[in-house]
């Protein structure tokens, strides 16, 4: 492990919508907990120094959301996210974190860290901002178009990660669809349902509907990247609207204000659980290294939590344990290996 006292995280210094100040504050907060942070960005704008437990690696070029991610990653060898991914690949850091372009982060991580054996497409997985037992949701943006076999792979990847990192024993896995019946949904969902229902080594509970996402009907919920991204942002927006409405109602009259005052501790805890910053970000599953895609609008606490998520994933050997769990059982091996020869993803 690169860091003598704990994990080392390579943090992309560009891309945070709240600017260099929030990124620097988040890096300092994570470093104060013993996480070594290497920030790739412009030293003067970041205003960080080695004494704070953070090392700044000069980088002055970035890849934005307006850029075509894959060509940009290949062409801009000195872009911050490319340098950070290379830092992990070369063994100087244990994990990559970026709050910049999702596409660029995925491309840089995939090129630099490489996919696990048998994995066709890495998937972005996020712990949903819901109270109670953790619910892992994937894919939330890496793969807009998928086939049944990809959904099956995502199911095994998500189940392995949920058990290894989130500590959920024998996680229940569901497919997001428009109805609970096995025949409901697009053809790839119907086909994936049939494959998973017949597979061993996974606790498949069938289809789940959108209303079931926050209710714990499954510990791992699988869908394509387009649907997942829309659903995740809808949940984030709804949570923000609900907490805002509660605050507004509590100020509507003196009696409501008194009730709001009495409820403040409980509502504060609920708000923290629903806050997207609390999850840290989405982790790219299926790679031979750790890569976390943080929310672009994250504040300092969200940035620190993304670094913490990456460091925790290193501490518990998420990659090794996920790979080991995937190797257990013929169903898991078959689900991953049967798609390797698919020329469409070569």
Residue ranges and their predicted role:
Residues 110-137, 217-221, 225-336, 342-346:
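Glycine-rich phosphate/nucleotide-binding loop
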Residues 9-21, 73, 142-152, 293-300:
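Short, glycine-rich nucleotide/cofactor-binding loops
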Residues 50-93:
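Phosphate/nucleotide-donor binding subsite
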Residues 12, 40-41, 57, 98-100, ...:
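Short beta-strand segments
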Residues 21, 38-44, 144-210, 219, ...:
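Glycine-rich phosphate/diphosphate-binding loop of Rossmann-like nucleotide-binding domains
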Residues 1-46:
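N-terminal phosphate-binding or glycine-rich loops at protein starts, especially the Walker A/P-loop
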Residues 14-15, 61-62, 101-104, 111, ...:
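Short glycine-rich anion-binding loops that position phosphate/pyrophosphate groups of nucleotides
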Residues 17-23, 77-91, 95-109, 120-125, ...:
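Short glycine/serine/threonine-rich phosphate/pyrophosphate-binding segments
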């Amino acid at each position: 492990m690169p860091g003598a006292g704990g994990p080392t995280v390579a943090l992309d210094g560009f891309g945070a919508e709240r600017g260099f100040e929030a990124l620097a504050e988040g890096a300092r907060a994570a470093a104060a907990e013993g996480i070594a942070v290497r920030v790739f960005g412009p030293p003067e704008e970041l205003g960080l120094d080695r004494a704070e437990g953070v090392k700044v690696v000069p980088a002055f070029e970035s890849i934005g959301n307006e850029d075509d991610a894959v060509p940009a990653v290949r062409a801009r060898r000195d872009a911050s996210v490319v340098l950070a991914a290379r830092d992990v690949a070369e063994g100087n850091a244990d994990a990559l974190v970026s709050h910049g372009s999702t596409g660029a982060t995925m491309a840089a991580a995939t090129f630099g860290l490489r996919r696990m054996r048998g994995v066709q497409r890495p998937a972005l997985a996020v712990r949903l901002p819901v109270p109670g037992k953790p619910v892992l949701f994937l894919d939330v943006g890496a793969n807009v178009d998928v086939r049944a076999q990809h959904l099956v792979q995502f199911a095994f990847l998500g189940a392995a990660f949920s058990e290894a990192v989130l500590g959920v024993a024998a996680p229940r896995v569901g497919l997001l669809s428009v109805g609970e019946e096995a025949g409901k949904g697009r053809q790839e969902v119907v086909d994936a349902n049939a494959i998973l229902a017949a597979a061993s080594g996974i606790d498949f509970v069938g289809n789940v509907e959108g209303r079931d996402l926050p209710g714990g009907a499954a510990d791992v919920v699988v869908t394509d990247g387009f649907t997942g991204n829309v659903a995740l942002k809808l949940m984030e927006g709804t949570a923000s609207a609900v907490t805002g409405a509660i605050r507004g109602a509590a100020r509507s009259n003196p009696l409501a204000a008194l009730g709001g005052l009495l409820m403040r501790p409980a509502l504060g805890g609920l708000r923290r659980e629903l806050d997207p910053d609390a999850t840290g970000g989405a982790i790219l599953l299926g790679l031979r290294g750790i890569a976390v895609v943080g929310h672009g609008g994250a504040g300092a606490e969200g940035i620190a939590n993304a670094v913490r998520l990456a460091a925790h994933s290193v501490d518990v050997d998420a990659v090794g344990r996920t790979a080991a769990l995937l190797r257990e059982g013929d169903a898991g091996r078959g689900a991953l290996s049967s798609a390797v020869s698919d020329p469409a993803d070569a």
